[in-house]
Amino acid sequence: MEKIFERLMYASRWIMAPIYLGLSLVLLGLGIKFFQEIFHVLPIIFEMREVDLVLVTLSLIDITLVGGLIVMVMFSGYENFVSQLDVGEDSEKLSWLGKLDSGSLKNKVAASIVAISSIHLLKIFMNVENISNDKIMWYLLIHITFVLSAFAMGYLDKITRK
């Protein structure tokens, strides 16, 4: 009975596989939004103010960072919790694949969240005259919370690895 239960528990990790595959659909959606933004900007690029172009660029960087985060979670999560990726000898293999444990993944996710939050904060500062001081304060507090959380997670990971 115990062996059956343990095998069932071990096999249940495959429930995560479609979830990781679903993240690729989110990645596709981000790609669509990325190019939608580019196609929206191209016809009016010569009439745009520099500030508006910088804001669009920050939005595109934001989408790119989120996409990278999705790829990292998708591949690393699959390898850590479901099965090792076998992409073949003749195809490109990402250098970090198979090297990120769950602790490293959490730290990379936290760093990505801080980077994404920084982009949002920069967009807020680019439009500071249209945003109330209370909202700016809340954005800053949330960003500082992300930074401190990422720092704490990294520190805890460092002391537990010793």
Swiss-Prot record:
It comes from Shewanella sp. (strain W3-18-1). Keywords: Cell membrane, Membrane, Transmembrane, Transmembrane helix. This is UPF0114 protein Sputw3181_3501. The chain crosses the membrane at residues 15-35, 53-73, 136-156. It is a multi-pass membrane protein. InterPro entries: UPF0114, UPF0114_bac. GO terms for cellular component: plasma membrane. It holds the Pfam family UPF0114. Belongs to the UPF0114 family. HAMAP family: UPF0114. It is found in: Cell membrane.
